[in-house]
Swiss-Prot record:
Residues 1-24 are annotated as: Disordered. Disruption phenotype: Eliminates the production of fellutamides. NCBIfam families: AA-adenyl-dom, Thioester-redct. Induction: Expression is positively regulated by the secondary metabolism cross-pathway regulator scpR. Residues 1117-1436 are annotated as: Thioesterase (TE) domain. It comes from Emericella nidulans (strain FGSC A4 / ATCC 38163 / CBS 112.46 / NRRL 194 / M139) (Aspergillus nidulans). The modification O-(pantetheine 4'-phosphoryl)serine is found at residue 1041. It comes from the Eukaryota. This is Nonribosomal peptide synthetase inpA. Nonribosomal peptide synthetase; part of the inp gene cluster that mediates the biosynthesis of fellutamide B, a mycotoxin that acts as a proteasome inhibitor. In the first step of fellutabmide B biosynthesis, inpC activates 3-hydroxydodecanoic acid to generate 3-hydroxydodecanoyl-AMP that is then loaded onto the T0 domain of inpB. The 3-hydroxydodecanoyl-S-phosphopantetheinyl-T0 is sequentially extended with L-Asn and L-Gln by the two CAT modules of inpB. The linear lipodipeptide from inpB is then transferred onto inpA for the addition of the third amino acid, L-Leu. Its EC number is 6.3.2.-. InterPro entries: AA_adenyl_dom, ACP-like_sf, AMP-bd_C_sf, AMP-binding_CS, AMP-dep_synth/lig_dom, ANL_N_sf, CAT-like_dom_sf, Condensatn. PROSITE patterns: AMP_BINDING, CARRIER.
Amino acid sequence: MSHSMSSSSSSSSSSSSSRDEGQSRLNNVLSNIAKQCRTTSAQVQDVYPCTPLQQGLFALSLTSPGAYMAQHVFRLQPFVDQGRMKQAWNVVLQKHAILRTRIVMLGENAMQVVLKQSPEWRNCSDLRAYLDADQSITLQTGEPLTRWAISDTHLVWSAHHSVYDGFSVELILRDVATAYADGEIPPRPSFRQFIQRMFQQKQKSLTEAYWKKKTAHLDEVDTFPRLPASTYRPRPNSVYKHESSLAIDGPSGVTLSTIANAAWGLVQSSHLGSEQVSFGTTLSGRNANMPDIDKVVGPTLATVPVLLDVRSSQSVADFLQATQAYFTELIPHQHIGLQNLRRLNRATEAVCNFQTLFAFQPGMTETQGQSPYGHLLTAENKDKVEAAFYSYALTFQCSLAGTGIIKVLASYDDKIISSSQMKRLVFQFEHIVSQLISSNGSKRLSEIQLISPQDLDQLDIWKRKMESYEQLLPLDAIQRHIDTRPDATAVAAWDGTLSYVELDAFATRLATWLVHEQKVGPEIVIPICFDRSQWMIVSIFGVLKAGGAFLLLDPIYPENRLRYMIKMVNARTILVSESCRARFEGVPGAILAVNAAWFETHTHASIPMRELPVDRALYLVFTSGSTGQPKGVIVTHASYAASAAGHMPALGMNENTRQLFFASPAFDLSIYEILGSLMCGGTVCVPTEEDRNGSVAPVIRDMNVNLISLTSSYARHLRPEDVPRLETLALVGEPLARDVQRVWANRLTLINAYGPAECSVVSTVKRPVTLDSNPANIGTTVAGRAWVVHPKDHEILLPIGATGELLLEGDHLARGYLNDEEKTAAAYIFGPYWAPSPTPRRFYKTGDLVHFDEDGSIVFEGRKDSQVKIRGQRVEIAEIEHHLARLFPNAAGAAVDVFKHEYHVHLVAFLFCDKESWNSSDTPADILQRLGDVNVSTMSHIKQQLEQVMPHHMVPTRYQIWARMPTSLAGKLDRKALRKELGNQSTTVIELDETSTEFPVIDSTNKVALRLNHKILDLASEEKTTLDGRDFPLSILGLDSIQLITIVTFIRSEYGAKMTVETLYDLKLTVTGLAAMITSPHDRPAEAAPTLDLSKELQRVYRELTRRSESIKHKRKVFLTGATGLLGSQILRQLLADPSVQRVIVHVRANDAAKGMARVVSAATLAKWWSSSYANRVECWPGDLGMPQLGLQPEQWRMLCGTADAGAPITSVIHNGAAVQWQAPYQALKAVNVDSTVELLTAMAQWSEPGSFTFVSGGLKRSPGQDLESFMKSLEQANGYSQSKFVAEELVSRFAGHQSTHRVSIVRPGWVIGTEKDAVPNTDDFLWKLVQACIQIGAYPAEGGDLWLAVADAEEVATRILATTFAASGESPSVDNVEIGTTVSRFWELIKVQTGMELTQMSAEDWKQAAQDFAASQESEQTFLPVLAMLQDPQMEFGVQRPANGGPPSNVNAAIRSNIKTLVETGFLSDSSEVVIVED
């Protein structure tokens, strides 16, 4: 009994304890909730979980202020009673708990809390001010999600999308109208009931399984529109509205929503060139299985990804049915929430990265459109709400009613989609909707016209604007100049000059021999292989006059490849230079060395008059082929005439043109360098192979070249100042590099030219390329017409702006491929259905992916296949993979891909193993022997084998062995995984490298070979430490032509030995072999001795004598402070560029010399000028300007004082270092800025020989006519920096006045910015900090717009500093005020134009007040320290009176523009764009 009682008592006690603990936990939770909501627990009415959508939207709003927070502005009708309206809203608020909801975080869970509250009404009489203040409120957890304000004329309801949707707005406003009329609000299901019904654990599991299955087949998902960078966050700031009517008679069984979504899928597919599209859509959620769900007030909507298969081969009916089925199937699974979907796996994460949100709303009939609350409220800003509401790059809202009215409201980020492009997208969407509605269901998707009628009209307009020119056949064009300008120079070569009449005479004699002795005529191809000379040009012209066609061969190509091409053209005669004759020994047919000696014995000139067909072959050029062998392109006289008629004027070619023959003869660019120059009546300038492969700048100068065509890779090694008379630079063969554009765009006429060999060299030209041009823009067609089609189906014409394959049409198309009808038919197509014509129209499929820009020009995006450009020449990856696979037949696979490192493009080869061939414990040699030939066991063996069958530029430079082949979800080779591995190597990948044991050590006595080894490895783009001191073949490094040219130039300057690049292409040439050729000239291959132009040689030698004399006369040793800053780095650069400066000692704040030097190199690398060749002329002394004796070592201090025993004395000091701190007082800066100057002058006073001291000043400057006393008085209230620089400068000035031994200079720069060319501004500089602050404030001080802003780029200031430092004479101290600059108004105009922002002008005082107010809330932000300094410094000015000699050099404004552009691109200068609404 007692046990029973005891047991009962214990149970009761336990239950009571549990209840107490539960109540305690509940109280704690309620207390936490109340704290987050800043209220009391008694005010909490209900708590329940958020939907995934609510949680996602709320999270986005926390990271993107303003997102998903809408301000609904209503105009009150005149009779509306304000008090009664407020009471009506109070009733509705109590009726619908969702309007009293807030969101809090309990652990990791987002919960919605319903409070017992009434709305807090604010006044919005000043509507604009209220909206601005309301919009600035930052959303936080526990904060109200709805706010209200009212005035006599307006009511504002601000609401977060987590508490309402479009249906809810209508229901709420209807209830407000009912309550205003004292009616009874009908009962509605609560949002809590919706959550309980829809979000169950069982459904969650089913939903996750559904989405995993739905995305399992995905390979990769592309987004539309594409973002400019992965870190870019879209900000929709523009709206486009459009309305039109369509005939509605759609397919039965398909909803209008289905048609709209299917149409958008086609739009997106057309712009991405993808058959798998993904975009987001917002579903109402009102189709779920719940009674009266259409009456729920709350956000029942759901955002989900839409995945559509847009294969062009399927029927329209099948596509529409599949689209409708997609939406039907996902109804039970629509509420998963994007944030939850992302977490499932890689595929589901990818489909959530969409940037287009497509929303369809059924259109309302006229009766449905009548508002039950319109007599009370009228919405005023609905469109603007939608524009700023979402965070996607594009939100496309569409309504389509049975009446045929289609309405579109698109909100978009205009930095990603322009307004004109947005219009085109809407027109295209409307056009596709119309076709889907009216089409026969059996029609294929490929038959749906994706381009709108408006786009077709625009293409025709662009075509009509093209200029047309006279077309002359090459021989006719050249003959015109022979007849009218016989004495004009046709060829200016290193070995002679030929006038047009002389060229014709020699060519006629050669043609006579070819016709009579070799039976040359139409369609007979003559290979021509020369080291560059005048006789090569004669040979080309001679073949043409004989009626034949020519094939230019590059002597450096592998012998196997040369012989293959000769065999392909069935050559019976080959024309060569004497130096190339040996390469063709044993080749069937006549080998003729064309030179002066031959013409001495062949004087007969008689060619029979014949009518020759215009479509006969003019020349052949071989390009890389995917089958392992090159393919020959046949260009006819007529096709080249059509091309030349357009590209010669586009390139600016005329009778005054002097064009350098620079391209490889194997590159079709060489054709227009030669034939184009002659056809326009210009001059072909022919350098020696040695000069062409060395430094080309002297060649350009000596030959007065005014037009040259280069790849960006090569142009990067030229400087404008080295070729001052060069007028036009055409960049060809590879994408235009941005850094090259910055250097050249404003220095001459810069051109971006594009054209496949199959279309006669040049097809499009962008002229001129400016600093603002898109480097990927290849211009407009110069011959024929361009079209953009679907990459997988040329029967589908794409709209303007869509990415697709470029098709070229016109008379300039080549005949086709030699002996390959199948490839010709695949590449040259006739009459796609969108190009109807009585006669078939012919098009060439380039394989290049492009899109039309808004002005009709073409923007290059890449390749649709594996073809790439290496050093300007086209390379089929498949051809390399073919030869690699033949070398390793036992491999599970082989692949080649492109790897970009800095400015270099490399080919990387991959070999894949299987379980049998891979063993991680084996050496690479063991694995290679299992995969292929036992004789190929090292990386160098592989390269040597490949170079026997392919040109040097096609041989990969890196090699990897993989344990297995990486595959995508679709089972294909995953090339992305290959590229990722290149930067992050795993244990299942072996990187091949030359092993040190494979190559012998170079004898320590062979100094030349060791020096070459060091130089060559320095040039290699990747570290090869295992080859240090080893004797290896040069070919294994995969050096490109520019690197080989550098070696040739080095050998010439270091050892005086002449060498050609062709020599270095020898596969077996080793380091010691190259050294032997230098030290023993007789070991070098014999070259034809060129004739010597004594006049030019004398000029060259005298220039060299003058340069050396000046250098010997002034051997300088300079001590420089502040070398790591923007200006200091530029000073150091110019010192090292001066041959008279033997050594520069840089004083750097660092713990040791190595770290100090690293800082110097880092600054110089950032400024894009550092070269390892400078290292031996720079010495780093670590120290601290603020310490006694500058913190130097005793011996270093003695050297600075000139009292050390050893070493050449220091001859100049440039004191550029200083401490710049915005708010530091004088005493804090004195040690660095003043005491360091005392130390340096103390050291200099001990020099026994005259020297120079230059002080770089700063801070406030004395106004013209201002006496010293008043200036010093004004400085008493200035900042510490200005005070310290003044004291230091005055100290220098007085030191100069008390001695006469040394030359003392003071340079006073204004604001120093980055150069126009490199545009590397110092973001810590006061000027840019001020601009940044003004942009964020939204205003700038504009008082005195005509005042002067002294600003110059670092290069200009450094030049002035060195000029005064090394001046031979002049007063001491000399003072150089760098007063070049621009007006204050012009400066701010440049800021506004370059950033695209509208900034408000203010007076100085008003701006200071605005800045003070703004900075008050930003005191912890470093950005506003300069602003605070300005506010606190009464002497700080926004500009000065324009000096008498103040004037901007031509590049100041350009430099400012360039700096601003860099600051915008890096995000340092950012804006907040306003919403712009555009309506039809």
